[in-house]
Amino acid sequence: MESWLLRRGARVRCLHPPSWLPAWCFLCLLPVPQTLQLTGLVSLTHTSLPIMVSLANTDVFFSCRIEDFTRLQRDLPVKLFHTDIHGRRRWEKQINCQHRPGMENHTRDCMVKLSQANTSATGIYYFIVEGEETYQSDGVVILVRDTVYQPPAFKVQEALMLGFTSLMSVLGVLGTALLLWKKKQISVLGKHTAKTCSGLKSTVGTTKPPAESVYTSLQRRETEVYACMKEETGSPVFSQSPATKEKLNRFEDDNEFNLVYENL
Protein backbone atom coordinates (compact mmCIF):
# COMPACT_ATOMS: atom_id res chain seq x y z
CA MET A 1 0.00 0.00 0.00
CA GLU A 2 2.73 2.41 0.90
CA SER A 3 4.63 1.53 -2.22
CA TRP A 4 1.50 2.20 -4.23
CA LEU A 5 1.09 5.61 -2.60
CA LEU A 6 4.69 6.42 -3.34
CA ARG A 7 4.18 5.43 -6.93
CA ARG A 8 1.02 7.53 -7.11
CA GLY A 9 2.85 10.47 -5.56
CA ALA A 10 5.65 10.12 -8.07
CA ARG A 11 3.11 10.06 -10.84
CA VAL A 12 1.44 13.11 -9.39
CA ARG A 13 4.73 14.91 -9.08
CA CYS A 14 5.52 14.04 -12.62
CA LEU A 15 2.15 15.20 -13.84
CA HIS A 16 2.11 18.30 -11.63
CA PRO A 17 5.67 19.53 -11.09
CA PRO A 18 6.40 21.99 -8.27
CA SER A 19 5.95 25.74 -8.81
CA TRP A 20 9.70 26.43 -9.03
CA LEU A 21 10.21 24.15 -12.01
CA PRO A 22 8.41 26.27 -14.67
CA ALA A 23 10.31 29.37 -13.54
CA TRP A 24 13.63 27.49 -13.73
CA CYS A 25 12.80 26.16 -17.16
CA PHE A 26 11.78 29.66 -18.31
CA LEU A 27 15.08 31.12 -17.11
CA CYS A 28 16.94 28.42 -18.99
CA LEU A 29 15.12 29.20 -22.21
CA LEU A 30 15.28 33.00 -21.87
CA PRO A 31 18.87 33.61 -23.12
CA VAL A 32 18.19 31.82 -26.38
CA PRO A 33 15.66 34.30 -27.89
CA GLN A 34 17.44 37.21 -26.25
CA THR A 35 20.67 36.33 -28.00
CA LEU A 36 18.82 36.10 -31.25
CA GLN A 37 17.15 39.45 -30.68
CA LEU A 38 20.38 41.28 -29.87
CA THR A 39 22.16 40.04 -32.96
CA GLY A 40 23.01 43.14 -35.04
CA LEU A 41 21.29 45.60 -32.67
CA VAL A 42 22.76 49.13 -32.72
CA SER A 43 21.45 52.16 -30.84
CA LEU A 44 21.97 55.78 -31.91
CA THR A 45 21.25 58.50 -29.35
CA HIS A 46 21.69 62.25 -29.76
CA THR A 47 23.65 63.87 -26.95
CA SER A 48 23.10 67.44 -28.15
CA LEU A 49 20.03 69.61 -28.43
CA PRO A 50 17.46 68.54 -31.03
CA ILE A 51 17.10 72.13 -32.28
CA MET A 52 20.01 74.55 -32.53
CA VAL A 53 20.21 78.16 -33.73
CA SER A 54 23.47 79.82 -34.68
CA LEU A 55 24.75 82.94 -36.40
CA ALA A 56 26.51 82.80 -39.73
CA ASN A 57 30.30 82.39 -39.87
CA THR A 58 30.39 80.62 -36.50
CA ASP A 59 31.16 77.00 -35.59
CA VAL A 60 28.32 74.63 -34.76
CA PHE A 61 28.87 71.47 -32.67
CA PHE A 62 26.55 68.51 -32.20
CA SER A 63 27.12 64.85 -31.31
CA CYS A 64 25.61 61.41 -30.96
CA ARG A 65 26.33 58.16 -29.09
CA ILE A 66 26.48 54.74 -30.75
CA GLU A 67 25.98 51.58 -28.71
CA ASP A 68 26.68 48.18 -30.28
CA PHE A 69 24.95 45.42 -28.29
CA THR A 70 26.32 42.56 -30.38
CA ARG A 71 29.52 42.38 -28.27
CA LEU A 72 31.51 41.99 -31.43
CA GLN A 73 34.85 43.71 -31.88
CA ARG A 74 33.94 45.78 -34.86
CA ASP A 75 33.88 49.41 -35.90
CA LEU A 76 30.82 50.08 -37.92
CA PRO A 77 31.16 53.00 -40.35
CA VAL A 78 29.25 56.09 -39.32
CA LYS A 79 28.06 58.66 -41.83
CA LEU A 80 26.37 62.02 -41.60
CA PHE A 81 24.09 63.48 -44.24
CA HIS A 82 22.33 66.81 -44.51
CA THR A 83 18.89 67.65 -45.92
CA ASP A 84 17.78 71.20 -46.66
CA ILE A 85 14.52 72.82 -45.66
CA HIS A 86 12.84 71.33 -48.75
CA GLY A 87 13.79 67.77 -47.79
CA ARG A 88 16.47 67.33 -50.47
CA ARG A 89 19.68 65.55 -49.48
CA ARG A 90 22.58 67.93 -49.98
CA TRP A 91 25.67 65.95 -49.03
CA GLU A 92 26.85 62.89 -47.13
CA LYS A 93 30.21 62.18 -45.53
CA GLN A 94 31.85 59.68 -43.19
CA ILE A 95 32.83 60.77 -39.69
CA ASN A 96 35.20 59.36 -37.08
CA CYS A 97 34.01 58.30 -33.64
CA GLN A 98 35.97 57.57 -30.46
CA HIS A 99 35.51 54.51 -28.25
CA ARG A 100 34.76 54.93 -24.60
CA PRO A 101 37.37 53.15 -22.50
CA GLY A 102 36.24 50.26 -20.31
CA MET A 103 32.82 49.85 -21.85
CA GLU A 104 31.76 46.27 -22.61
CA ASN A 105 29.11 47.27 -25.12
CA HIS A 106 31.61 49.18 -27.27
CA THR A 107 29.99 52.59 -26.95
CA ARG A 108 31.33 55.29 -29.23
CA ASP A 109 30.91 59.06 -29.15
CA CYS A 110 30.72 60.96 -32.42
CA MET A 111 31.37 64.71 -32.45
CA VAL A 112 30.59 66.82 -35.52
CA LYS A 113 31.82 70.34 -36.13
CA LEU A 114 30.43 72.62 -38.83
CA SER A 115 33.10 75.26 -39.42
CA GLN A 116 32.05 78.77 -40.43
CA ALA A 117 28.50 77.70 -41.17
CA ASN A 118 26.41 79.95 -43.39
CA THR A 119 22.74 80.06 -44.25
CA SER A 120 23.10 77.13 -46.64
CA ALA A 121 23.89 74.94 -43.60
CA THR A 122 20.32 75.32 -42.37
CA GLY A 123 18.51 72.00 -42.38
CA ILE A 124 18.29 68.61 -40.67
CA TYR A 125 21.30 66.37 -39.99
CA TYR A 126 21.09 62.58 -39.60
CA PHE A 127 23.58 59.96 -38.42
CA ILE A 128 23.73 56.60 -40.22
CA VAL A 129 25.41 53.39 -39.07
CA GLU A 130 25.93 50.83 -41.80
CA GLY A 131 26.34 47.22 -40.77
CA GLU A 132 24.29 44.11 -41.37
CA GLU A 133 21.45 46.58 -41.32
CA THR A 134 21.35 50.33 -41.76
CA TYR A 135 20.41 52.37 -38.70
CA GLN A 136 19.41 56.01 -38.87
CA SER A 137 19.12 58.45 -35.98
CA ASP A 138 16.56 61.14 -35.40
CA GLY A 139 17.31 64.44 -37.07
CA VAL A 140 19.05 67.44 -35.52
CA VAL A 141 17.54 70.71 -36.74
CA ILE A 142 20.07 73.51 -37.20
CA LEU A 143 19.04 77.05 -38.13
CA VAL A 144 21.79 79.43 -39.26
CA ARG A 145 20.93 83.14 -39.42
CA ASP A 146 22.98 85.65 -41.36
CA THR A 147 21.76 88.63 -39.29
CA VAL A 148 21.11 89.21 -35.63
CA TYR A 149 17.68 89.86 -34.22
CA GLN A 150 16.10 93.01 -35.56
CA PRO A 151 12.99 94.65 -34.17
CA PRO A 152 9.98 94.58 -36.47
CA ALA A 153 9.63 97.46 -38.90
CA PHE A 154 7.20 100.31 -38.35
CA LYS A 155 3.84 98.88 -39.29
CA VAL A 156 1.28 100.61 -41.46
CA GLN A 157 -1.43 100.15 -38.84
CA GLU A 158 0.66 101.95 -36.24
CA ALA A 159 1.28 104.80 -38.70
CA LEU A 160 -2.44 105.11 -39.43
CA MET A 161 -3.28 105.08 -35.74
CA LEU A 162 -0.70 107.77 -35.02
CA GLY A 163 -1.95 109.93 -37.90
CA PHE A 164 -5.58 109.57 -36.82
CA THR A 165 -4.73 110.49 -33.23
CA SER A 166 -2.78 113.56 -34.37
CA LEU A 167 -5.62 114.65 -36.67
CA MET A 168 -8.20 114.35 -33.90
CA SER A 169 -5.99 116.33 -31.54
CA VAL A 170 -5.57 119.15 -34.07
CA LEU A 171 -9.30 119.23 -34.82
CA GLY A 172 -10.08 119.37 -31.10
CA VAL A 173 -7.77 122.35 -30.59
CA LEU A 174 -9.19 124.17 -33.64
CA GLY A 175 -12.77 123.51 -32.53
CA THR A 176 -12.07 124.88 -29.06
CA ALA A 177 -10.43 128.01 -30.51
CA LEU A 178 -13.38 128.53 -32.88
CA LEU A 179 -15.89 128.30 -30.05
CA LEU A 180 -13.97 130.82 -27.96
CA TRP A 181 -13.70 133.22 -30.93
CA LYS A 182 -17.42 132.88 -31.69
CA LYS A 183 -18.32 133.57 -28.07
CA LYS A 184 -16.17 136.68 -28.08
CA GLN A 185 -17.74 137.92 -31.32
CA ILE A 186 -21.22 137.46 -29.91
CA SER A 187 -20.37 139.42 -26.77
CA VAL A 188 -18.82 142.29 -28.78
CA LEU A 189 -21.81 142.39 -31.13
CA GLY A 190 -24.21 142.59 -28.19
CA LYS A 191 -22.35 145.51 -26.67
CA HIS A 192 -22.28 147.35 -30.03
CA THR A 193 -26.02 146.81 -30.55
CA ALA A 194 -26.87 148.15 -27.09
CA LYS A 195 -24.71 151.23 -27.68
CA THR A 196 -26.29 151.91 -31.07
CA CYS A 197 -29.84 151.67 -29.70
CA SER A 198 -29.07 154.07 -26.85
CA GLY A 199 -27.56 156.56 -29.32
CA LEU A 200 -30.63 156.44 -31.52
CA LYS A 201 -32.94 157.09 -28.56
CA SER A 202 -30.89 160.09 -27.45
CA THR A 203 -31.09 161.72 -30.90
CA VAL A 204 -34.85 161.41 -31.24
CA GLY A 205 -35.57 164.60 -29.24
CA THR A 206 -32.90 166.72 -30.98
CA THR A 207 -33.82 165.86 -34.57
CA LYS A 208 -35.56 168.71 -36.36
CA PRO A 209 -38.67 167.92 -38.33
CA PRO A 210 -38.60 168.44 -42.09
CA ALA A 211 -39.57 171.76 -43.55
CA GLU A 212 -43.33 171.91 -43.87
CA SER A 213 -45.99 174.56 -44.11
CA VAL A 214 -46.77 176.72 -41.11
CA TYR A 215 -50.25 175.29 -40.64
CA THR A 216 -49.09 171.66 -40.77
CA SER A 217 -46.30 172.30 -38.34
CA LEU A 218 -48.65 174.05 -35.94
CA GLN A 219 -51.02 171.05 -35.96
CA ARG A 220 -48.38 168.35 -35.41
CA ARG A 221 -45.79 170.17 -33.34
CA GLU A 222 -47.42 169.68 -29.99
CA THR A 223 -48.24 166.00 -30.63
CA GLU A 224 -44.71 165.16 -31.78
CA VAL A 225 -43.13 166.90 -28.81
CA TYR A 226 -45.18 165.03 -26.26
CA ALA A 227 -44.77 161.70 -28.07
CA CYS A 228 -40.99 162.09 -28.22
CA MET A 229 -40.76 163.01 -24.56
CA LYS A 230 -42.91 160.05 -23.56
CA GLU A 231 -40.92 157.58 -25.70
CA GLU A 232 -37.57 158.64 -24.25
CA THR A 233 -38.44 158.53 -20.58
CA GLY A 234 -41.81 156.85 -20.28
CA SER A 235 -42.83 159.39 -17.60
CA PRO A 236 -45.14 162.46 -17.46
CA VAL A 237 -43.99 165.88 -18.54
CA PHE A 238 -43.67 167.30 -15.09
CA SER A 239 -41.09 164.68 -14.14
CA GLN A 240 -38.70 165.60 -16.95
CA SER A 241 -35.23 166.93 -16.41
CA PRO A 242 -34.44 170.68 -16.70
CA ALA A 243 -32.96 170.17 -20.16
CA THR A 244 -36.21 168.65 -21.38
CA LYS A 245 -38.22 171.52 -19.93
CA GLU A 246 -35.93 173.99 -21.67
CA LYS A 247 -36.56 172.24 -24.98
CA LEU A 248 -40.31 172.44 -24.35
CA ASN A 249 -40.14 176.18 -23.65
CA ARG A 250 -38.17 176.64 -26.85
CA PHE A 251 -40.89 174.88 -28.85
CA GLU A 252 -43.57 177.07 -27.27
CA ASP A 253 -41.64 180.24 -28.16
CA ASP A 254 -41.46 179.01 -31.74
CA ASN A 255 -45.21 178.47 -31.78
CA GLU A 256 -45.84 182.01 -30.56
CA PHE A 257 -43.46 183.42 -33.15
CA ASN A 258 -45.24 181.53 -35.91
CA LEU A 259 -48.59 182.78 -34.65
CA VAL A 260 -47.41 186.42 -34.70
CA TYR A 261 -46.02 185.92 -38.20
CA GLU A 262 -49.36 184.51 -39.35
CA ASN A 263 -51.27 187.49 -38.01
CA LEU A 264 -48.99 189.85 -39.82
Swiss-Prot record:
It is a single-pass type I membrane protein. It comes from the Eukaryota. Keywords: Cell membrane, Disulfide bond, Glycoprotein, Immunoglobulin domain, Membrane, Phosphoprotein, Signal, Transmembrane, Transmembrane helix. Disulfide bonds join 64-110. Residues 212-232 form the ITAM domain. One of its GO terms (biological process) is calcineurin-NFAT signaling cascade. Residues 181-264 are cytoplasmic. The chain crosses the membrane at residues 160-180. N-glycosylated. Glycans are attached at residues 105, 118. The keyword Glycoprotein applies. One of its GO terms (cellular component) is membrane. Residues 38-159 are extracellular. No direct interaction with the B-cell antigen receptor (BCR). Interacts with SYK; probably involved in BCR signaling. Interacts with ZAP70. May function in immune system as a receptor which activates via the calcineurin/NFAT-signaling pathway the downstream cytokine gene promoters. Activates the transcription of IL-13 and TNF-alpha promoters. May be involved in the regulation of B-cell, but not T-cell, development. This is NFAT activation molecule 1. It comes from Mus musculus (Mouse).
